[in-house]
Amino acid sequence: APLFVEYEDVLLRRAAAAKTPDQNEQLLVQVKDTVEVSHAAELQDYFQDDCVTTVASHRGVGTLAPGTAVVYPISFPDRLELLLETANGLKQVRVPVAGEKLTKEIRSFRRLIQDSQSQNYLSSAQTLHGWLVAPLQQDLQGAGIHTLVMVADGSLRTIPMGALHDGRHFLVDSLAVAVTPSLALTDLSAAQRRKGSLLSVGLTESVEGLSAPRYAESEVQAIRTLYGGKLLMNKQFSAPSLEEEIKDQGVGIVHVASRTVVGTEAGDASVMAHDGEQT
């Protein structure tokens, strides 16, 4: 929302001009909290459900696990601001790239990476890496970061961050990469995963004229090798069987390897099961 963006702009400019580290830290905390509130408001509007935010909990700066960093990319018409949070606190990094130029590059990257027969996406992948990751590289290495969480906004949510490229390696080759719309709505406590609490479902057959994802089978097998769990593939993957497994078997995580559609409203989202499109 424009009001949130304007407020974030004011806070970031004040933080950059702060005379003491304490003033800078306080202002950056306000920026982080404002971003979280704006993203939570977007999710409320998308799901048409005020209860979406009830899982949020207050989390102070410096409470991240060692080795974990969170990046809030905030795009403005005249620049990109990267708000980096580690166990050591918050840091602001300004990148001189206009919002329109960033959005154009993101769209180009998304379009090119969908062509599995070409590597033309690498140029865009390197450009985006130069804007989103490279300015933070020294801080990430100095803090011994192994897990990078991107609290993405807008078009940044549409691209695979792990596929950003530094000219030699993909980002996912050096860091575990996660993307979330809001960290305040994410449970950061260690999950107590039991062997078998994972349910993997997917399609390797064409359904209703739509081809199955090319690597669905190898993807599911790789996940099961790591975490075990139950598998429902092709005819076994139907709406009733999925509902039964989730309700009766105490499934904690569901991994889906199928065609999906995410619309502008929650009611427009769907996933393809063997018995057809499910909303």
Place the predicted regions along the sequence by residue:
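A structural signal for alpha-helical segments
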Residues: K19-Q26, N120, S211
